[in-house]
Each structure stands twice: as structure tokens, then as C-alpha cells.
């Protein structure tokens, strides 16, 4: 295939020299200067290189060269005659000039100052380049002064604004924002500024060829709506390629051919243009032409393989011949070999259209059939401002076109996912229309949620395209969606926030703005908070963190009421690992926003306490303890001060409430439950029973004949109350119990328990005989401790025997006593004991301190003792162990007695 560009034949050097000499003799210096300044197009591009001349001469015969020389000689003579005629018309010789012309010239010279003044008075806006820089304030003032929109000044300003906006948008385009740039570009009148658009696209592509695929996609979208703009860009591209080929400008050929290749991939240009360009480049192969052809073939080779396999086979066959026959550089030979390897791999590294740029359907695209060798008008006049007498009419026409295109684009984006169901929708609409004609009303319920999907997509695009939350809120409110979609909008804001890698304050501010604007948004976010907390286990950790931080922001700014925390109930049963993580991040974020003092004050607000009952539970000590441990573990222990006080005061409150409960309940089940609760309250101080029992036995030695049940109740009280604190209330309690015990003793003496007493005396005597061996070494210790007045544990060892005797008495009397009387006595003793348990428990801390002090004194004393003292100390340890074992046996017997009393046989 031969193009018109390749049909230019060079002439001989001798003819050139003759013509040049004759021309120089006949022409003046001014004419020669004009000829040098003339463009290559006027000279018909005769400055070919010697290598091209040799290549053209190599394949032609002598006859054909002679014919071509004669033709060139004739053409040159004709051209010289034309130039001489033009020169004679424009600049006649001085002798031929008329005197009238000289007179007119002198008069025009006199009028020059006046014309200069007129030029100086021109408006800077009307100059070709827009004039000097005008400050924005002055420019706005000048625009306000212009009232006639059809005036020249207004059209000039709108032209300059159009040029700036088109250049800015073209320079900003990339793969990610191409859809947004297209929408903004269509807002401008690109029909009026199509020359500016074409020039901007070509300049941007030549400056950055790496983004050629992006510019090609942009041109493809514009071509689908305005085919004349795509045709203009393609014409200018072809002319640029031909210009670069004639000038041997490799860089211009590379950029232009690459752009053409991508336009062919986008179906803007036909594949015939590609084959013509490749044929031209490989017809007379040089290193540069082969390199341009290979680069061009890489970009559009896969497309040519699909649409024209015979054509691409011919191109590769030509490359193979060049590789074997032509004398080209090694680098170019290697490039040809690489090209064959790329073809063998199926052009896998050079796809037709990159992902994200296939934005136009094949049916919507308009393909231009523009051959390479035709003459095209680049329409450069479109690049320059020209006044339009019908300016406002054309603007209104473009507004109508723009509205149609943008509305069509919105419907296309909404129907991308439901393209398959479009026919069904049309059938349903037809059926609905027929039924309406018959007079029947039919309601169609859409179960596919197509409208919901399109609504969510619209919101997502609005959020992602906004720079700040105020702009986003303005865009969303401008959509004017129905009130039924309010909650869906709030859900979409939360979902967008959860999808981010890290929490962005943008979403918290956006949600807060909507909550402040309308009550419905606030109620929607309240419901979403409860739903999210109930289903928080479905979220990943990253999404959970973002959701918690967003809701913390809403509560901190008081966009949401704090009553939403009512749904949070802290306990081991009602929480999961996900909900605990949510509460942890939520409160840590609140503490970071507000500070611990303000957060604590808000949680102590009396008006909000009903909503914090689940968050700070006080109904059950177990839940209270769980909440305290939870907040302490997350570093917010300062929020649990009141819970700790409540947990300390809980036993006192329970003890104060139980006597009233016992008076109201008369059933045996209520009495047994009250006794079990009192026993559970007294079980906290069982660890100190050994010390308290020894002291109680020494003080109550005169009441050794007291009944078993009364002594047991007294021992329980003394176990709780004895310590280093000798308060008056405890003394009064002991005296009252002693009097009650004596009365009970007198009653029981009437019944007579002679046998139990004799057995008790025998056992006590045996016990004393067994312990008599240790009295010799126990005396000096007691003497030493009595002199020093140190309350240590060794002072109590001498009382162990008496305590054991009394405990044996209690066990025997419990075995043979009347169970009915025992239950009555227990009720009385329990009611009295429960009144003072809250007072007696206060002394436990003091007893612990005293025991620690006594142990320290024992350690100091044991360090200074001799070997004999160490032996005695070992004996004391043995006695201590025996006392522990005896106490354990006593406790087990007591438990057995209690079980017998609670058994149904005993109650009957």
C-alpha cells in the first residue's frame, strides 16, 4: 500500500544547484529571507536526507529516474513562475511605483500616531492573549459591570474561563477519577470549545505518553456523545504523525502512533488506519521507522489479531524479511525478535483495554473511517476566540444537550446491575398498563431491592467524592430522598465508616451533623446503636473498632442521648467477647474525648441513672464485682468508686432487711432459708475461728454448764466480734447473750442430763491428764508473756484444753437435745445476732492487723531463743495442729446436726 506521503521523489543535486543559483541571481535579499522563513509545507519538503535519497535510488531503473527528474524540473519552473507573479503583485519595483502611492504613504505616516492611540485604548480583555494579569476582585467587578451577555467582552471572558477549566480538568484526569472528570467536563460547553479540548488532550498526551490509555478512554467517552469532537482529535493526530514522519521526528511519531493505537483499541479509529501506518513505516525500513512500528504494534497487536488476522500476518512477515535481509542495527534486530516473542505469548503484557477503562459499550461507540493519505483540515481556527452573534441561543441549546446526557448517564449507572431484568420490567409495565385500562388497580412490590441498591450506590459516590463533611452533608440533603430512606442513609454512613482501614473523624462529624439537623436522624441512629450492639459478634475487629469510635463521637458531642446505653448490661451471662471489646473501645474513646472526671460525672448524673443500671449493676453482688473488674482491667477503674462502696455496704443492707422479712414469713421454709443466709454471712470469718474460740473460752469459763445451742450461738458471735477492738456494743451483746444462756440453762436443768455431764467430765479429765506433760514448759512462756503484756498467740495455747472441753459439751448436748427447742432457740439467737453482724464485721480488719503484729513478735522472739525454746516451739506447733484438727471435727459435727434438723423426719 502506497501513501501520498511516500510518493514524493527527490531530484538530482546538479539540478538543485542550478536552480538555486538562478534563483539567487534573480531574487533580491528580502525575497531570499522570506524563502528561508517559509515553512516546509510551502517548499514541499524537498530537504530529504542523503540516506533516503540513496534508498529511493537503489530500487529504481535509470529510465524512471530520468522521467522523475524531468517532472520535478517542470514543477519547479512552474512554481518559480508563480512565486515571481505573486512577488511582482505584492512588492513592485521602485521605478514602477506611482507618485500617487507615495502620497498615500506619506499621508498614512501622518495618521500613525492616531492609530497608536486607538490601539492603546483597547480593552485588555479583547486582546489575543487575554491581556495583562487582572486581579480577581477587579475581574469580578468588571464582570458585574457587563450586563449584556451577547457583548464581545462577556463572550471573551467566558472563552477564557472555558479554556482554563478544560485545561485544568484534562491535566487532573486519571483512572480513578475519570468518571468524575467526564461529568465535570460535560458541564462546560465543549461544543464551543472543541478546538481547545482537542489541543489540550494532544498536548497532555505528548507531554506524558505513559497516560495515553487514560486519554484514549476520555476521548472514547466524549466520542460516544459528540462524534465530531472525536473526529477532530483523530484528524489532528493523523496530521501530527505525517508531520513527524516527514521531519524524521521519531518522538513525535512515537507519541502520535501510540495514541492512535489506543484509539483503535477503544474503537474510535478503524483498524485500516493502523495497517496503513505500519505499511508506511516498514516500506522503506530504517532503524527509527522499525522502532516506531514495533512500539505501535505492541499497543494494538492484540486488537489487530482479533479483527484482522491476515493483515497482522502480513506485517509480521514483512518484519521477518527485514530481519533477514536488511542492514539494520543489532538493537533493532533484537527488538524484532522480542516482538515475535510477545506475539507468541499472546500479548499478555499489552491488553486491549486496561481494567477500569472499559467505560463505553460497543454499541454506543462511533468508529471513524479516516485513511492516512487523505487531506484533512485541522480547523485551527477553533483554537482562537471568535465572537458568536447567537451566543445565548447556542448556550441554551448546549444546556438542553447537557441535561439529556447527564440524565441518561444517571439512568445508565442505576441500571448497570439490573440490565438482565430490564425486559421483565418492561413486560410488567405493559401488563400494568393493560390492567389499568381494564379498571383494575394492581400494586407491584419490588422484592429485588434494585432501588435500594441504586440509592446506596448514590450515597457511597457522594461520600467518596466529598472533600469534607459539610460538603457531603450538603450533597446528601440536596438529593431530597423520601423519609422512608432516612434509616438507610444512616446505615450507609455507618457502613462506609466501618469499611475504612482506620477510623476517620469525617464520618463521626457527618453523622453528628445529621443528628443535629433533624430528630428523625437522631432516632434512626439510636435504633442502629441497639441493633449494632445486639449483632456486634458479626463484625470483624477492625469494623467493630470503627463503629465503637463513631458512636463514642456521637455521645461525646451529645448528638445522641446517653439513654442509648440502656441496652448494655454488664454481666458474665449477658456479654460476649465481641460485646466486651466494643464496650472497652467505646469507653476508652469516651475517656479520651471527655477525660475521666467529666465521664465519671456524666455517669453519676441522677437523671440518667435508670439508663445505667445495666452498665453499672447494683442488683447482684456478682454482677457488681464483674463490672468493677471489667472497668479496672480496661484502665477505667476510676468509674467504679461508687460500685465499690455499694459492694462493701451490701452485707449491712442485707442484714438490716432480713429481720423484717423473717417477721413477715412464718413458714418453716422461710426460717430455714433465713438460717442458711445467716450462716453464709458468718462463714466469711471462719478462718479466724481458732484465735476467737480460745479467747471466748477464757472469758466464758464461769458458764461451763450452759446449754449446747446457746453456747454455740454465743461462740458464733464471739468468733465474729473478738479482736483487739473492745467496743461497748460488743460487750453489751455478750452480756445479753449470757443472761439468755443462763435462763436456758435453768430450764434444761429441770429436764436433767446427768449422764451427759458425767461423760463430759470424764473426757475432760482424760484430756487434762494427756496435756499435763506440757505444763512444765508452758509455764515459763506464759510467765514471760504476762510480764511483757504482749498479746501473742502463745498466750492462747493454755486455753486450748478448756475450749476443747466446752466444744465437747456442746457436741453432746446437740446430740441429745430436743430438736424443737433447738429450732426455737436458734431463731431467737439468729435474730439477735443478725442485728449486730454489720457492727461485728468492722472489727475483722483490726483482728487481722493484730494477728500480723503478733506473728512478727513471735518471729523476733523465736530468733533469740535457745535450743530449749525451739523444742518448746515445736511442741506448740503440735498443739496448734491438734487444735486445728479438733476444730475441724467440731465443724463437721455441727454440719451433721444441721442436716439432721433440716431433714423432713425431724420436722415432723
From Swiss-Prot:
GO terms for biological process: mRNA splicing, via spliceosome; regulation of mRNA splicing, via spliceosome. Residues 28-56, 66-85, 113-122, 726-770, 801-817, 826-908 have a biased composition (Basic and acidic residues). Keywords: mRNA processing, mRNA splicing, Nucleus, Phosphoprotein, Spliceosome. Belongs to the CWC22 family. Residues 163-346 form the MIF4G domain. It comes from Homo sapiens. GO terms for cellular component: catalytic step 2 spliceosome; cytosol; nuclear speck; nucleoplasm; nucleus; spliceosomal complex; U2-type catalytic step 1 spliceosome; U2-type catalytic step 2 spliceosome. Residues 407-438 have a biased composition (Acidic residues). Required for pre-mRNA splicing as component of the spliceosome. As a component of the minor spliceosome, involved in the splicing of U12-type introns in pre-mRNAs. Promotes exon-junction complex (EJC) assembly. Hinders EIF4A3 from non-specifically binding RNA and escorts it to the splicing machinery to promote EJC assembly on mature mRNAs. Through its role in EJC assembly, required for nonsense-mediated mRNA decay. GO terms for molecular function: RNA binding. Residues 1-10, 100-110 have a biased composition (Polar residues). This is Pre-mRNA-splicing factor CWC22 homolog. The modification Phosphoserine is found at residues 39, 61, 107, 786, 829. Component of the pre-catalytic spliceosome B and the catalytic spliceosome C complexes. Component of the minor spliceosome, which splices U12-type introns. Interacts with EIF4A3 and PRPF19 in an RNA-independent manner. Direct interaction with EIF4A3 is mediated by the MIF4G domain. Full interaction with EIF4A3 occurs only when EIF4A3 is not part of the EJC and prevents EIF4A3 binding to RNA. Residues 666-680, 703-714 have a biased composition (Low complexity). InterPro entries: ARM-type_fold (IPR016024), CWC22_splicing_factor (IPR050781), Initiation_fac_eIF4g_MI (IPR003891), MIF4G-like_typ-3 (IPR003890). Residues 454-570 form the MI domain. It is found in: Nucleus; Nucleus speckle. Residues 1-129, 404-443, 654-908 are annotated as: Disordered. Changing residue 331 to A: Decreased EIF4A3-binding. Pfam families: MA3, MIF4G.
